Amino acid sequence: MAFSITVPASTANLGPGFDSIGLALNRYLHLEVEQASKWSFICSSPGLENIGTDNLVTKAATFASKEWGKVLPPCQVVMKNDIPLSKGFGSSAAAIVAGIELAASVCGQFASKAEKARLASLWEGHPDNVAASIYGGLVIGTHSEESTEILHVEAPNIDLVALIPSKTLATKKARAVLPDMLSYKEAVQASSVANVLAAALVKQDWELVGKMMLADRFHQPYRQQLIPHLPDVCAYAQADEDAYGAALSGAGPIILCLVKEGKGEAFASRLHKQFPACRAEVMRPAVQGSAVSIAQA
């Protein structure tokens, strides 16, 4: 059986929605899969030319198949990827989701989106990126060892402009600068900001979304030491008439700006002139989540 898997990229957090809020993006990981006598991966995409068989796709596929009590047969995989690696667009999450989709297909296992999100969250430790890649659109979720709850909201009609530096940033390094704990007072304030962000996203009150992204207390104040231009970019987006605001995308270093629909190209041009060391790329939210297509005989 031959089939293809397509998984969208994602951005997470949107400021204070730390490890909870995710948005699917129109950049994709694409796999062409066929059962074979042994595992093999072929990829010519930048950074993945020498990918071996011991990778996140096979690890997640093995994990899922074991959870289902199935035997995972080897496959030949031809991979194409246009999600930037280690930049904050959920490249690892997309690989995890692709692995779960692969396992479900080759093992003949039906799995709902909720079940896939549960498995992916167990592997990843948080639901934001993986759930966005599975459902598409916007997701707000919570995860523990006992349960995973995901609220799915349709993709918003806005433009997105990503400010992309040349350097990468490992998630492990970005998490290392976070505090071990917040005081009760700090946690209450940070939580209230996140609550308003979630409500504003659901109501599509984009002015309020931008304001709340800037008010994050969970991670951006600590991570700006790794991305020194973050405050300047956020201030620039907040002041621009076509932008609602900006936030670190996931762990960074990409900074994602939320922009009025149809204004992305013009804003991206201005943003690049202001921050010429980075690339400004116009994007859109991805409406559809991960999908599997069976090849026609």
Curated annotation (Swiss-Prot):
Key word Transferase present: yes
Pathway: Amino-acid biosynthesis; L-threonine biosynthesis; L-threonine from L-aspartate: step 4/5
Record GO terms (molecular function): ATP binding; homoserine kinase activity
InterPro entries the record matches: GHMP_kinase_C_dom, GHMP_kinase_C_sf, GHMP_kinase_N_dom, Homoserine_kinase, Ribosomal_Su5_D2-typ_SF, Ribsml_uS5_D2-typ_fold_subgr
Signal peptide limits: none
GO BP annotations listed: threonine biosynthetic process
Chief localization: cytoplasm
Enzymatic reactions: L-homoserine + ATP = O-phospho-L-homoserine + ADP + H(+)
Keywords from the named record: Amino-acid biosynthesis, ATP-binding, Cytoplasm, Kinase, Nucleotide-binding, Threonine biosynthesis, Transferase
Source taxon at top rank: Bacteria
E.C. number(s) listed in UniProt: 2.7.1.39
Pfam families per record: GHMP_kinases_C, GHMP_kinases_N
Binding sites annotated in the UniProt record for ATP: P84, L85, S86, K87, G88, F89, G90, S91, S92, A93, A94
Localization annotation: Cytoplasm
Keyword NADP: no
Family, per entry: Belongs to the GHMP kinase family. Homoserine kinase subfamily.
PANTHER family noted in UniProt: HOMOSERINE KINASE, HOMOSERINE/4-DIPHOSPHOCYTIDYL-2-C-METHYL-D-ERYTHRITOL KINASE
Function statement: Catalyzes the ATP-dependent phosphorylation of L-homoserine to L-homoserine phosphate.
Stated name of the protein: Homoserine kinase
Taxonomic source organism: Shouchella clausii (strain KSM-K16)
Gene: thrB
